[in-house]
Structure formats: structure tokens, C-alpha cells
């Protein structure tokens, strides 16, 4: 089975908003490979380290909010 990692990354980025705290900081509780790809795309800070959270970049926050609305919000 071929996996489209960009779609997975979009879902992970959107779901990171569920653990948002202290501004643009989010808990890093997702697959490490997906988190590394999001970092390589410039959407989050480096996930490697002891800290249990990462920071969404301005671009990452904007994209995460848009994806969350598109994927998970209902239309009135």
C-alpha cells in the first residue's frame, strides 16, 4: 500500500492544535517521522530533544488552523 505522507502531515499538523498551549506551543504526541517532516517543511520547531512540546511557526499555525477548519469543522 502506498502512503501519501503529505496528507498524513496535513492531518497531524491540524490535530496538533488540539494540544495547543502557551501561544504557539503544542504537545508533540504524534509519529516521530511525521513530526520530523513538519520540521523539515518549516512548520514546527525541531522536535528532537527532552522538551515534550514544539512551537508552531507562524506559517505552521496559519496552515494548521486552515486545515483544522477544512478537515474537522461542520458547515452551518
Label the model's feature ranges.
Residues 1-33, 70-73:
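Short amphipathic alpha-helical interface segments
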Residues 23, 46, 64:
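Short, electropositive, low-hydrophobicity segments enriched in small/polar residues
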Residues 32-35, 61:
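Short functional linear motifs
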Residues 35-41:
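Basic amphipathic alpha-helical segments that dock to polyanions
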Residues 41-49:
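A short, conserved structural fragment
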Residues 51-56:
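Minor-groove-contacting beta-hairpin "wing" of winged helix-turn-helix DNA-binding domains
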Residues 58-76:
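Short, amphipathic alpha-helical interaction segments positioned at domain boundaries
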